[in-house]
């Protein structure tokens, strides 16, 4: 066989649903790569003969290979920090109170408007490197800290540039509808007009976004405004998603499902009717335990109902300066289990196959299947559950991206 590389002495957590074993596991396995794709995988005993003198062979020392991790919800590009708000919350101020007093997202908006692209790129690069060291091979990055045309475009340009200069694939999401900017404080509908009539066309003209998102909440955009933005995005051929039911149950998830959204994110206050709507539309539920933990929330997402209705559950970092300044997907695995009572297998599925579904890229990544992109990680672990069980010592030993060894 003519391959570019072969990995032996490994166990595979393929996350392939067609394999009945937990994690889609194949023990005592091997995997071969050709032209950036997975060319063969299976039990080591069934590996076809190949020229060991001309093809690089990597020995996994009994470790586990998983698909590359996918962080499907981040706000990775921002300037400044909000440590002062952290102190205020510890003194009793709520997220909503801080936002209504001009803090929260708006304080980060000011810092981002003042920062240039070079500064934002370097900050984003450092954060992306941190995720990459934990086995992340694909990441979604949202805008939303500009809230004017110039700065929203600036953030999205930086995200695109990061994708060009880093081995991690970057998917971009336009989140101009993240908050009401100060200049539109008494005219939120006017700001929605700006998003639809000026921002969105400018984003499309430069091909800066793969999807459009809205923060549907009582401190941000109402249902009617949300539908206007998402409908405009959908009409333009972009994927849509939604921050929904984080602080209250406004019915945003049902709206997103009706419009065919790829995902609804946060969903702590999602009810059974909303879960049923997601199930019927195939929309993913993105769980964000970092924000739940950092904001010290008590209302948990309805995991049992999501299981009951077969809604794909995704885990993501929601890395951002205000509600989840936690740049770690491995910690999300642990939090997903300890805070939301996911099983370790559900948690890992949420950072691989289901995360790919939330981004619409499941045909190419998210599981180890012949023909898919060769994005995978070798972990120094004895069982896949160990990734969720233990935190603090990074067990990621090697990362292969598009068939190339990028971290060793």
UniProtKB/Swiss-Prot annotation:
N-formimidoyl-L-glutamate binds at residues 145, 320, 322. Its main location: cytoplasm. 4-imidazolone-5-propanoate binds at residues 82, 145, 178, 246, 323. GO terms for biological process: L-histidine catabolic process to glutamate and formamide; L-histidine catabolic process to glutamate and formate. It is an enzyme of class 3 (hydrolase). One of its GO terms (cellular component) is cytoplasm. Zn(2+) binds at residues 73, 75, 243, 318. InterPro entries: Amidohydro-rel (IPR006680), HutI (IPR005920), Metal-dep_hydrolase_composite (IPR011059), Metal_Hydrolase (IPR032466). Fe(3+) binds at residues 73, 75, 243, 318. One of its GO terms (molecular function) is zinc ion binding. It catalyses: 4-imidazolone-5-propanoate + H2O = N-formimidoyl-L-glutamate. It is found in: Cytoplasm. PANTHER family: IMIDAZOLONEPROPIONASE, IMIDAZOLONEPROPIONASE-RELATED. Catalyzes the hydrolytic cleavage of the carbon-nitrogen bond in imidazolone-5-propanoate to yield N-formimidoyl-L-glutamate. It is the third step in the universal histidine degradation pathway. This is Imidazolonepropionase. The gene is hutI.
């Amino acid at each position: 066989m003519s391959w570019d590389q072969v990995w032996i002495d490994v166990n595979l957590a393929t996350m392939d649903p067609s394999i009945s074993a937990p994690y889609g596991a194949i023990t005592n396995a091997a995997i071969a790569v050709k032209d950036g794709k997975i060319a063969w995988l299976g039990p080591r005993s069934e590996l076809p003969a190949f020229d060991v003198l001309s093809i690089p062979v990597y020995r996994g020392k009994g470790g586990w290979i998983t698909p590359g991790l996918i962080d499907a919800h981040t706000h990775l590009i921002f300037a400044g920090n909000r440590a002062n708000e952290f102190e205020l919350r510890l003194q009793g101020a709520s997220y909503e109170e801080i936002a209504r007093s001009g803090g929260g997202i708006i304080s980060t908006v000011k810092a981002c408007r003042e920062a240039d692209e070079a500064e934002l790129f370097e900050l984003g690069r450092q954060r992306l490197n941190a995720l990459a060291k934990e086995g992340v091979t694909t990441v979604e990055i949202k805008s939303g800290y500009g809230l004017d045309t110039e700065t929203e475009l600036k953030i999205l340009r930086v995200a695109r540039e990061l994708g060009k200069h880093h081995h991690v694939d970057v998917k971009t999401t336009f989140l101009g509808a993240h908050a009401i900017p100060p200049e539109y404080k008494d005219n939120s509908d006017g700001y929605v007009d700006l998003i639809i009539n000026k921002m969105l066309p400018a984003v499309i003209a430069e091909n800066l976004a793969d999807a459009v998102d809205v923060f549907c909440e009582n401190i941000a955009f109402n249902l009617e405004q949300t539908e206007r933005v998402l409908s405009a995005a959908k009409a333009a051929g972009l994927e849509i998603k939604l921050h929904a039911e984080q602080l209250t149950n406004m019915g945003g998830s049902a709206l997103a499902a009706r419009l065919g959204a790829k995902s609804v994110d946060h969903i702590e206050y999602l009810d059974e009717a909303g879960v049923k709507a997601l199930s019927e539309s195939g929309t993913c539920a993105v769980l964000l335990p970092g924000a739940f933990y950092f904001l010290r929330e008590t209302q948990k997402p309805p995991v049992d109902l999501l299981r009951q209705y077969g809604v794909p559950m995704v885990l993501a970092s929601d890395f951002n300066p205000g509600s989840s300044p936690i740049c770690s997907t491995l910690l999300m695995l642990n939090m997903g289990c300890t805070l939301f009572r996911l099983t370790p297998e559900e948690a890992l599925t949420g950072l691989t196959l289901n995360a790919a579904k939330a981004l619409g890229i499941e045909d190419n990544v998210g599981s180890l299947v012949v023909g898919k992109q060769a994005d995978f990680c070798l972990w120094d672990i004895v069982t896949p559950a160990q990734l969720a069980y233990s935190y603090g010592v990074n067990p990621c030993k090697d990362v292969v991206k598009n068939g190339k060894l990028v971290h060793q």
